Amino acid sequence: MRIPRLASPLLLIALALIGGWIAAWLLLPDEVAHLSFLVTIKLGIEVTALCLLLGSFPLYAALRQPKWPKLPHVLVAVSLGSLLIPTIARSLSLSALFSFYGPLATGLRVMRLWPQGQPLDSSHAAVVIALVTLYLPFTLLILSESMPSLGRMPDVAGTLGAGVLQTSLRVTIPRLLRPLATAGLVVFSQVLGVIITPRILGSEDVTLAVLIDDLLKRTMNTPEALRIAWAEMALAIPVAAVAAYFIEKERTARARPLQPALRFRGGRVLSVIPLVILAVVPGALLILSLGHSPILSMASLFQSGPTLEWFRRALLEPGFRRVLLPSFMVWMAAAAFSIFPALLVSVLILPYPQVRRSFRLLALVLLFVPQNALGVLLFMVLSRFPAAQASIPAWLLGGMGQAVPGFAFAFLLMDRVGDRLRRSLALASTLGASAWQRLLKVALPNLAPSVAAAFVATALITLDDIIFVRYLPRLPVNTAATELFGRARYGAAPDLAAACILMALFILLLVACGHIAREFPAIRRRLVASVGRPKVAAELGVEGAR
Amino acid sequence: MKWKRLAFLATGLLFLAACAQGQKTNEKQPGGPLVRPKVTLHFASFGGSFQDDLDRAVIKPICREIGCDSQVDAYSGEYDHLAATIKNGTNPFDLVHVETRFLIQGGKGGLLAPINWKEVDENKLVPGAKNRFGVGLLAWSLVLAWNQSRLPAGTPPPSSWKDFFNIKKYPGPRALRNTPEGNIELALLADGVKPQDLYKNGLDVDRALRKLSTIKPYISWWTSGAELEQKLSTSCIMAAAWNGRVFNLKKAAQVPVAFTYDGSINQFDWWVIPANSAHKNLAMKFLAAFVNGQGQDTIAKNFGYGPVALKALGAIPPDLLEQLPSDPTNAKLGVPFDGEWWAQNEAAVEKRWNQWLLGH
C-alpha cells in the first residue's frame, strides 16, 4: 500500500514538470533560448537538491535534541532573519568572500581542490552556493511546518525491529514526501527567475532570466523577451501550482505528534549546519561594513581593526536619506493595496471553504512564480494603457505592483486564522452580537496579528524590489533598493553593506514591535496578575497568598 | 472614547490644514506682479554618487543660467522601458543620459529628437562627441588595467591586450564585462588585428570568440562598476575596465592599480532628447550651454571621465589630464568605438555571444 502513496505526488510532479517543460520548449524562440533553458533547469535541480539535503537532515536532527528544545525555533528564526538581507548586498558579500586572493579560495587551491589561476567567485559552484544560502531558508521554513508531525514514529518503527532503510522507506519518506516535494518545487520555481546573483558573482551562466534582461536592456528585443517570459511562466506556473496543492494538502493533513521525538545520536553537529550556512552572509556583510577599506574587502577588518565610519556615512549620506520618503510611500502604498483587499476578501469569503481554498492556491502560485517574469508581463500589459501609466503617481504604481505578491502574502496570513475566526463569529452571532460588533470586537482583533505580519512582509518586498518600481511607472521611483542598485553600478563602498545592515535592523525592530503588540494583552495580564494579586491579598488580609 | 475623539479631531485638523495649504499655493499674490512658474527640465541618469555630482556641478548651474528648474531621476539603463514610454507617449524625461547603443538604436527607431546643431556649437566639443541625435556627455575608455600587487615578482607590467591573454606570464583570473561590445574588439587586437583594420570589413566575431575561448576558464565576468572595482582589487590580476573605475580605485581606495590607454576602446556617453519631450527647445538650450563645459572638470576630478567640452579640457590640470581619455595623446592610442556597426549587428552578435557563453 506504500507505493501508491509515494506514487501519487511523484506522478503529479512529473506531469507538472513534463507539461511545463514541453510548453516552455515550444514557446522558446531559438537555439540560444533552448540552451539557456537547459542551463536554468540544471541550475534549478542542483540548487534544489542541495537545499533539500542541507535543510531536511539537519532539521530532522534538530527536532531530536531534547536538551535543546528551542533549536528548531532558532532555525526558523534564523531562516526568517536571513531573508532580511537584500539580494544585491548578499551577492556582493559572497563575491568578496569567494575572492581569488581571499583565504577561502587560497585554502582550496593549496589543498588542490580548486584549479590554479581560475576564479572561484564567478564559478558555477559559487553561484550554486550563493543560491543555496538564498533559498535554504525557504526549505527550512516549509519543512519546519510539517516535520514535527513525524513525532516518535521513526523511533517506534525502530523499536518494532525496522532497520534504518526500512524506516526511511516506509515511515519517514512517505510522511515527509509532500513537504519535501513542496520545498523542492518552491526552490526550483524561484531559481528560474534568478538574475542578480549570477550577474554580481560574474558567472557565465545565461539563465532564462538573464537572457530576458539582456534582450530587454541591450537589444530592446521586447517581443522575444516576452516570449521567453511566457516560457518561464509556462514552466513555473505548473510547478508553483503543484507546490500550492501540496501545501494545501499538508495543511489539512498536519497533526500534532502524540509524543515528541527521541534523541538522535550525533545529530547536534548536523543540526547546526544550516545555522552556519545562514550566518555566512550576514557575517560577511558585517565584516565588510566594519573594515577600514573603502572597497568591499574581507581582509580589511583583520588588517586594520574595526570602524563604525561606514554606518555613520550610511546614516548621513544624502543619497540614502533622500530615498527614505519615497521608500516609505511605496511601502505604504504596497501595504494598503495588499492588506485592505486581502482583509476584505478574507472576510467576504470566510463562509465559503471552497472559495477560500481556491484563493489560497492562487495566492501561493502568485508567490512562487518568478517575479522577474511577472514584472515583465505586468509591464507589457500596463504599456497598453498609457493614460493609466501617466495619471497614477509613480510611487503609487510601484506600490501597486509590489502589492501583487503583497496581497498573496497578506491573504495567506489572514487565512491562517480563518477557521478560528469563523467559529468565533458564529459564536458571537449566537450570542446576539450585531454585524458591527462582530466586525469590531471579533473579526478585527483576530485578524490584527496577521495584518501586522502582512505589514512587515510588504516592507520586506519593498526593500528588495527593483522590478516593480523601475518597470511599472513611467517614471522610476527611487527607493532604498534602487539606490543600492545605483550605488552598486558606480562603485560599492562598505557604506552599502552598512546601509543593508541598518535596513535589516529596521525590519527586525518592526518585527519586534509587531510581536510586542501581538503579545501585549498577555503581557498586560501577566503584569496585572503579578502586581494585582499581592494587593488583593493584602486587602483581604490573607498572608502568603502568592 | 476620549482617544477616538482626539483622533477624529486630529484627522479633521490635518484635513483642514491640507486644504488650506492647497489653496495657498493656488492663490495669486495680491498686488504683486504675476510670477510665471519656472519650467522644470526633467533629467534621467544612472543614479548613485555620479548622478549626485552631475546634478550639483553641471545640471543645476546650467539650469540656473538658462532660467529653469531641474529634476533628476535615476534609472538603470532600462532602455526597453525608456523606449516603451517614448512610444506610448508617457515618457517624462527631457534629457536622458544614455550609452552609444541606445543613441544609435533610438535614433534609427524615431525615439529621439534630432539635435539642432545650429543652436549647439559643435566647435566647442572634442572630436567624436557629436551625433545627429546626441551630444557627448562624457568620454570614457575600456582600458587594460592591472593590480600591481598581484603581478608575479620581477614581471614587467602588461602593456597590451596580448598580455591580457598570456596566462603563463600573468597567471590568475581576468575580469571582463559581460557584453560582446568591447570584448570582441580587444580580443581581435590581441589576435593581431591592427587598430585601423578593426572595423574595416566588420568585426570578425568568430575569430574574437576563438581567441576569448583560450582564456575562458580564467575569466571573471563583471556587469556593474562595483563588481569591477571589487574584482580588480581583490579577485583578479587584470581587467578590461572602465577607466573611471580604475581612477576611483587609485584615488579613493588607494588600491595599487594601473592602466594603459594603449589599445583602449574609446566611447562616449550621451545626452539625448526623447522624441516626445515636453520641453525640446529648453532642452536644446541646456545642451547649447552644456558644451561650454560648466562643471565637467568636477566630473573629471571625481570620477576620471573625460570632459567633452574643449573649454573644460583646458581648465584641467596637466597631471589629471594625462589620466583622462579626452587627452589628445591618450585618444590617439585607442580605437574609437563604432556604434553604427554595433547598432546594425548587435542582435546577431548578442545571440552568438550568448551561444558562446553557453558553451557552443
Segments predicted by a language model, with ranges:
Chain A
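Juxtamembrane inter-helical linkers in multi-pass membrane proteins
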Residues: 158-159, 163-167, 253-262, 299-306
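Short helix-to-coil transition segments within interhelical loops
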Residues: 65, 153-177, 421, 427-447, ...
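Glycine-rich helix-loop "coupling/hinge" segments at transmembrane-helix boundaries
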Residues: 194-222, 298-304, 465-493, 528-531
